[in-house]
Amino acid sequence: MFAHNNTEIDYFKIACANALMVKKNLNVPVTLITDSGTADWGKSALGKDFVDSCFDNIIEVNRDWMFKNTRNFSDTSYSTKSLQFYNCGHGAAYELSPYDETLLIDSDYTIMSSALSKCWDSKYDVMINHKIFSPLDAKPYTQNVDELSITLYWATVIYFRRSDLARHLFSLVEDIQLNYGYYRDLYCFSSSMFRNDTAFSIAIHMLNGFNSEEPIISELPIVGLLMSWDRDDIYCINDINDITLYTEKVKQSGTYILTRLKDTDVHIMNKWAISRHIDRIIELYKEITCQEAT
């Protein structure tokens, strides 16, 4: 997991909550990659003992203060803010990971099931999804990087093992980040904001011989990534692995459907929504992990 705080969003605390969920549902060690400022803030605010209970390793990397990457963050359809989005380290995950097999998970992809346990001992060296869906979608679908560009792969969850394929993929992602303007022109997408999703999509396309047919990279052994968009909200955390969302209706801004998810992983993209319920999540999963430890 990566966590780099900005002026308003405490990614470190979100990562702590998700680490407890990982330990409960996947029962594997968790390593956090962060910067010293974020780590110092997290340990001061939450307590070193609690932080140590969440993570087996914390790897501190230098934060590139010259990296400027601004994006709009929404808290439902009623509030949007422009904030710094420090997401430039994923390409280094291959070298930084202390494991032979790694699940690279965004801190806000909440692990509420054991579904990703199917990844271990896979015959594939790398797995990453291009299929996504929301609670209101009848079936998963695929997007493109831009209207006339290549298939979009989501770097929200990536499985990889030590292998030449994985090493080449992550090395390419680092090169794409360094030369993002060139690749933006080459692949005909308009946004100048750096996205790991875009960088991995380009790298996969290149490794596949600049071809989208018969991709060299397999998808994760799940139906698709379940997305709760930043226009949605959280109604309540009912219990362990049990959440109820306000899911905004398509093309009906501000109109919601209550959606209950149980034993289902979900990418919660409204960071303020998860922050409003973070203490409840920590309380529930901290208690259950302590019980299981004894």
Give each language-model segment a name.
Residues 1-3, 11-17, 32, 40, ...:
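A glycosyltransferase accessory/donor-loop signature
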Residues 21-28:
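Short, acidic, metal-binding catalytic loop of nucleotide-sugar glycosyltransferases
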Residues 22, 94, 158, 200:
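A residue-level signal for conserved active-site and pocket-lining positions in enzyme catalytic cores
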Residues 26, 53-54, 98, 122:
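Short, structured coil segments at secondary-structure junctions
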Residues 29-37, 60:
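Short beta-strand/loop segment that forms part of the nucleotide-sugar
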Residues 39-97:
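Active-site-proximal specificity loops/subdomain of glycosyltransferases
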Residues 86-136:
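GT-A fold catalytic core of metal-dependent nucleotide-sugar glycosyltransferases
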Residues 129-149, 287, 291:
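A short, conserved beta-to-alpha structural element at the edge of catalytic cores
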